[in-house]
């Protein structure tokens, strides 16, 4: 609510499958956090993450990701997610922009291509696919935090991460 100045978020946010505790456990053990935008990476508190030996990263601008996405005719968000999700040290996923990243992660989990994440913050914003991607992810039974409907965004994803870190850092 503080990040958006929108009180409706109190009714839209949803926490599933012990998301907070699962996220805290992954952070305590030091993990990588994949972000679908560099804006999330830049917003995440590197100082606090370093206290837990955690690192936030994004691959959408990676030259190999750009090349592969072009060759396959898909978005960089899809290819970035494919690569990040296969890294066994990536336990948390913050998705604030690209519904395609959330769909890709869901498909990989359903096909048992990857270990189930410790936490997914799925809050892509927008009119095309955002609400649907967030809704379909709920069926997986994994620790998940979302904002129902079209609202969300990179700043919301960062604020959710910071909320969890704040609880741990007190």
Q: Model-predicted segments: where are they?
A:
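Generic secondary-structure signature for well-ordered alpha-helical cores
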Residues: 5-9, 25-32, 49-50, 86-89, ...
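Short, glycine/acidic-enriched capping/hinge loops at junctions between secondary-structure elements
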Residues: 11-12, 43-47, 157
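Buried hydrophobic positions in well-ordered alpha/beta secondary-structure cores of metabolic enzymes
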Residues: 36, 120-122, 160
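C-terminal functional extensions of proteins
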Residues: 128-170
């Amino acid at each position: 609510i503080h990040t958006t100045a929108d009180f409706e978020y109190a009714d839209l946010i949803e926490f599933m499958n012990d998301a907070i505790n699962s996220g805290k456990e992954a952070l305590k053990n030091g993990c990588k956090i994949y972000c679908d935008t560099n804006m999330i990476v830049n917003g995440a508190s590197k100082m606090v993450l370093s206290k837990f030996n955690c690192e936030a990263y994004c691959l959408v601008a990676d030259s190999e990701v750009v090349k592969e996405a072009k060759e396959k005719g898909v978005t960089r968000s899809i290819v970035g997610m494919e690569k990040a999700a296969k890294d066994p040290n990536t336990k948390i996923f913050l998705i604030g922009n690209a519904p395609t990243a959330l769909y890709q992660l869901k498909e990989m989990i359903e096909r048992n291509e990857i270990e189930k994440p410790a936490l997914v913050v799925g809050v892509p914003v927008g009119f095309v696919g955002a609400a649907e991607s967030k809704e379909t992810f709920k069926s997986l039974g994994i620790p998940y935090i979302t904002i129902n409907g079209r609202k969300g965004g990179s700043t919301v994803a960062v604020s959710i991460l910071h909320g969890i870190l704040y609880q741990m850092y007190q």
